[in-house]
Amino acid sequence: SICVLSLSLTQKYHRFRAVEYGATGLMGIHWRTAEVAPQVSGLAKFPWNHSLTSLDAWRLFFAAEIGEGVAERAAQIFSAHADSYEMPRPDTWGGGSPGIDGPGEIRDQCPGNSSWEPPLSRYDFVEQFHALRTQITDPGALSRFDLWDAHVRVARHQTLVGCDWNTLEWCIDGIPAENASSAAARAAAAKKCLPSRVKLVNSTTLLVNALLASVGSAGTIGSVQNLMQHTFPLMLGLTQTQLESALGEPLPPAALPPTKFRGVERLFVITARLRAEKGRSLQVKGVLLSQHVVSSAATPTLHHRPMGSSVAWTNVTMHPKMAGRGVFLATIGAAAMQGAVEYYLSCELPGSTLVWPATAPAVPHTVVVAAAIER
């Protein structure tokens, strides 16, 4: 008998004594590889140390991720406020968008009127965790900290967005029906909803910026897609249609989502490969998040050389996979893939230079090579 647990539920896996109900093994299932690193780490350690507590697991994880100096405090914060069922859940699975059953729908956590108070007290730990940032100096540790910081900020922003959406819908519900009132009365009622719509757009922008700051794997790209496909059509699309119908004119620019990126500029690789086949070219995909991404001048460069060597870097200008999308490709040729290689990405922007990984060029990303695996 095998006990199968989703790793999203295994922060306190030591509570689940599978043997008590006849299970003789434990299998972890996950679908967000990087994002469930704490659970994977804890699950791997527990069989060797059954006295391991949740606090212990977080302490060990954060010591490796962001350094010994802040690991204890970070572990205390997460163990008390973000551990398993302690973590607030601002989204839900399906039930909102017609015909869609899946994750990523923002959950309404407000009372359903214009006098709501967002339940933010459960997110006090977000600022407590963020305050640790000033104590981190290592570029690599700081980069990893920022990813986890963005993840918890996403949850808080989702709660705010859910409340702002609820307030807007409460106002829209008060607009007289078309067959029961004059056009002027409907327009006047709709205009009273514009401040709520603007507030929703602003809070949604903050959510998207935090979500994009958390992207580091294909799994987090899936989180972006979930919101875009399951929540935004109703929250932003339908409410826009309803308001414009009542107003008799398009919404003002402030009530529309921004068309330019407003978040923290980033350059990164999605789930970078650690191993490649000897003598076979390696394609590298870089993602640039910047308001300058539409500019031909904002083009990343791939720098590579044999691992551990002091020879000059081979510089390869990356080319866009699709115009204006911020996804760039470059290839390390087969001739260079005879042994382990190291590489990093850089991009010159107005006023700043972005690099990936954050420790580059001193500590670039490494790819080992091996003979092809026979299948």
Where are these regions (language model features)?
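Substrate-binding groove of N-acetylhexosamine-processing glycoside hydrolases
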Residues: 1-254
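Glycan-association/targeting regions that enable binding to alpha-glucans and other polysaccharides
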Residues: 236-375
